[in-house]
C-alpha cells in the first residue's frame, strides 16, 4: 500500500507499507485495545490516513467486526451514528471532540455502547479532557504514530486518564504514552546513542510495522531508517516509567 505523508517537512513522500507492516500493526491494535468480533467501529477521519484505514478499518475487518464510515465530520452526525449504530470504538482528533462538547444537546444522546474512544495528533487540555470524560465516560486513550510506522507507535491508555490520580500521574496526561505492544522505542542522540530518561532526543522506533521505505526516494529512506531504527523526526524525552513527552519536531528546534 502506498500512503502519502502530510508533508510537514516539505513535499509529501510516498510511504511504502507492506502486507507484513499492516498485519503487524493490526495485530498490535487488536491485542492492545482488546477488540473483538463484537467491535463496531466508526470512521470519522479520512480513509487516506493510516489512523482510519489501518488502525480502525483493517483492524476491525481482521477480527470480523463491523465498520461504519461517515462521509465527512459533523459533530451532530457523529453522536447520532454512535447512538443509531451502537458504535463501540472510534478515533477522533481533539478539535473534533471539542466541537462535540460544544453541542447543547450532546448529553441527550445514548452513548453507552462506546467502550473505546481514541484521540491523537495532540494532547488535550485538562479542562477539555474532564468534559470529554464526563460525556463519554472513562474510555479515552491517546495514540501517537506516523505513516512511516503504519499508524500507532505508543498509547496513553484509558487507565492513565485517571483525573483523581496524584500530581505525578496527572503529569502523564502531557505525554503521548509508552511502548505499544511489539514496538521498541528509544530516545537517541544524533549519533544513535540511547539517552537516559529526562534527556531530549529523537524518538526512534524498531518493529515489524516500520515502512519498507519512501517510494522512489532511496536517499530519504536511508535518512529515515538507520541500522533498523525509524528516526521519526519527533524530539522528546522519556521518563523513568517510559512515558514519552514530545517537545517538537527535529527541524523546528533551535
Which role does the model predict for each range below?
Residues 1-4, 11, 34-40, 181, ...:
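Conserved pre-ATP/AMP-binding loop-to-beta segment of ANL
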Residues 5-8, 41, 47, 82, ...:
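Conserved S/T- and glycine-rich ATP-binding loop of Class I adenylate-forming
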Residues 87-92, 101-171, 184, 194:
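Gly/Ser/Thr-rich phosphate-binding loop
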Amino acid at each position: 500500500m502506498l500512503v502519502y505523508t502530510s508533508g510537514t517537512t516539505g513535499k509529501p513522500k510516498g510511504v511504502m507499507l507492506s502486507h507484513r507492516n499492516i498485519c503487524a500493526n493490526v495485530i498490535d491494535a487488536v491485542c492492545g485495545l482488546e477488540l473483538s468480533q463484537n467491535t463496531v467501529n466508526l470512521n470519522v477521519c479520512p480513509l487516506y490516513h493510516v489512523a482510519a484505514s489501518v488502525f480502525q478499518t483493517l483492524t476491525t475487518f481482521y477480527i470480523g467486526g463491523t465498520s461504519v464510515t461517515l462521509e465527512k465530520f459533523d459533530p451532530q452526525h457523529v453522536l447520532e451514528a454512535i447512538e443509531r449504530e451502537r458504535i463501540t470504538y472510534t478515533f477522533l482528533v481533539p478539535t473534533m471532540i471539542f466541537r462535540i462538547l460544544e453541542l447543547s444537546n450532546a448529553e441527550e444522546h445514548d452513548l453507552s455502547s462506546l467502550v473505546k474512544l481514541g484521540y491523537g495528533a495532540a494532547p488535550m487540555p485538562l479542562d477539555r479532557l474532564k468534559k470529554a470524560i464526563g460525556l463519554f465516560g472513562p474510555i479515552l486513550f491517546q495514540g501517537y504514530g506516523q505513516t512511516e510506522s503504519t499508524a500507532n507507535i505508543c498509547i496513553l491508555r484509558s487507565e492513565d486518564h485517571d483525573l483523581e490520580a496524584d500530581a505525578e500521574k496527572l503529569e502523564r496526561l502531557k505525554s503521548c504514552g509508552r511502548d505499544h505492544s511489539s514496538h521498541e522505542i528509544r530516545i537517541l542522540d544524533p549519533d544513535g546513542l540511547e539517552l537516559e530518561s529526562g534527556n531530549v532526543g529523537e524518538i526512534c522506533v524498531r518493529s515489524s510495522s516500520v515502512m519498507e521505505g519512501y517510494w522512489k526516494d532511496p536517499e530519504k529512506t536511508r535518512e529515515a531508517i538507520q541500522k533498523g531504527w525509524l528516526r521519526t523526526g519527533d524530539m522528546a524525552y522519556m521518563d523513568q516509567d517510559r512515558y514519552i513527552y514530545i517537545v517538537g519536531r527535529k527541524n523546528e528546534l533551535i
